[in-house]
Amino acid sequence: MGVPLLDVSQLQAGPEARKQYLQALVQSFRDYGFVRLTKHDVPAKRVQRIFDLSTQMFNLDIDSKLEFANIADGSPQRGYSAVGVEKTASLHGNLIGRRVDEKLTDAREHFDCGSPLDKSFANRWPEKLQGFQQELESFYFELEQVTAGILGSLEEALNCPPGTLNNMITKENNASELRLNHYPPVPAGTLRNGNVARIWPHFDLGVITLLFTSAVGGLEVEDRNAPGPQTFIPVEPETEAELIVNISETLQRWTDDHLPAGLHRVTIPKDLDTEIQNDANVEIPGRYSIAYLCKADREADVGTLPVFQTGEAPRYKAMTASEYHRSRLLTAY
């Protein structure tokens, strides 16, 4: 069946349509940790503009990109990270208590920026690209608003008091990040040798993630309903403006596992499987994505929220989002 595609405009189509949308939203998150959304508030032309800027930035020579490189010290990521720097296999392995071979790397480079209002961790920008900073800062605030709407829908669907989730993510202290991903062209054999993946299976660290992907596929999510061994299924958006949303670790903690985080990976697109079976030298095309990683305020408690405590001992103890994210990020580099 695959990850459902929901029409956000149903929220305004009357009480029954609204109820059905909210029920379907929660069910998709429980089944897959993911949902696909159409008729949201981000125009297709706006998404395309950010993809164009992303392409320009990643096309800079490596020396230029290193001028605004991220410093991997456990602090929030800011600037450029080269291919292979982030290791998602280690990130997930540490979470589930499994030792991971350090040779497992990601065939991906990325750029991260935080809120323009963040006074604690300054962004690092490519000075050679005119308008890049201004466009991304504006897009950051646009996705901030879309995120608030999705979390408001979840509050309503889960019968939470208004603000239960959104009050943990304030504009003045927003720790969320906007990320541009680039997966360079790579021989299929490189991805089949067992040591390299575009992204290894992992959970995102924040509350929810908003994702736009380019036409080249490869995103796969865990099918929790499949019998037998762990199974992944492709997520295939119909357009680049379709919004993919996934549950991340913090929301799983807040809801005491009522909404588990969505396990996902990026691999060889399914439509190329037949072609590459006979030739490991076939080149997998480059791929781009845009992710808004919604995160709780740094001093917010990421333990189980009282509204989701059932009388039994909560699964997740109190700790700040800053403490949690720092401990997790140090395993990814």
UniProtKB/Swiss-Prot annotation:
**Any one Gene Ontology molecular-function term assigned to this protein's record:** dioxygenase activity
Per the record, the pathway is:
Mycotoxin biosynthesis
Give me the residues that bind Fe cation, please. 202, 204, 264
- What are the alphabetically sorted keywords of the record? Dioxygenase, Iron, Metal-binding, Oxidoreductase
Give one GO biological process term.
small molecule biosynthetic process
Could you tell me the EC number(s) of this protein? 1.14.11.-
Against InterPro entries, the record matches this protein to: DIOX_N (IPR026992), IPNS-like_FE2OG_OXY (IPR044861), IPNS-like_sf (IPR027443), Iron_ascorbate_oxido_reductase (IPR050231), Oxoglu/Fe-dep_dioxygenase_dom (IPR005123)
Which family is annotated? Belongs to the iron/ascorbate-dependent oxidoreductase family.
Protein name in the entry:
2-oxoglutarate-dependent dioxygenase ucsF
**Gene that encodes the chain:** ucsF
